[in-house]
Amino acid sequence: MTDYFSVLSGWLIPIKRAMDEWDIDFNSALADCGIKTSDFKDPESRISAERVSQLIEYCNHLKKRHDFAITVAENFHPGTFHTLGYAMMASNNLYDAFKRIERYKKVVSNTCSIKIEEGPKVCKLVLTPFLYESTNRPVLSQNSIIIFIATLVKFARECSSHNFKPQEVNLNWSNTGDTFQFLGDFFDCLVNFDQDEISFSCNTTILKEPLLGGNPLITQSHEKMLNEFLSRLDKNDVVQIVKNSIHDMLPLGTPTQTDIAKQI
């Protein structure tokens, strides 16, 4: 089967804000990375995960820096996650908000899995990137992973009455030449490299303290919209897979329906 990994176009909201801070021309950057500007105008459009990773690297390279991912996270907007973002903002507590992103993560992207491991004192959110079937390479780049984790921490800081910070962050790559030294400043906690997993841990009590903006009625209506959105995504995924399969087989001649079915 030909996989298609994508992210919600809402990610372009904080990316554009970050580009404005870094004095980078948004439209030119999108064009250079093969992203259509029309995707920015459609809140339900999907963008190739690979293209977005290239866009992040493009901005770092242009300014000869390494921390564009953190600037993106600092510019978090609920619309980044579509309806899910607003449902998370109206959650009873941070634990409920994180459980929603565990459940509806596909709205944000289909590039990884998210699992919350709950303990009496510590909760851990584990992110596992999917792999490209043909190369076994992780779909998410290191900077894409940083954006996702840092965005969740920024969200928690926006919603919580606490000066929220994780207890620790674990990353599965090396900090060669202190390239990622800036992460400690943002997360304000221990950042461990060369680990067997990608995760961050939080105090369970803090995660379960009520949020001032909690509203069950709002979250119920938003979850209905999210379920409908997921249904549309599933249909679109099938269409995209068929298109990719046809494209892959064209060099071998016009594929038959049977050929395509075998690839799905």
Question: Model regions: which residues?
Answer:
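Extended mid-to-C-terminal alpha-helical interaction segments
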Residues: 185-264
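Short, well-ordered alpha-helical segments
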Residues: 13, 95, 142-150, 216, ...
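Surface-exposed, interaction-prone regions with an acidic/low-complexity signature
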Residues: 2-17, 132-134, 141, 145, ...
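N-terminal regulatory/effector-sensing and dimerization cores
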Residues: 82-204
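Surface-exposed helix-capping loop/turn segments at secondary-structure junctions
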Residues: 25, 160-164, 252
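N-terminal low-complexity or simple alpha-helical regulatory segments
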Residues: 1-126
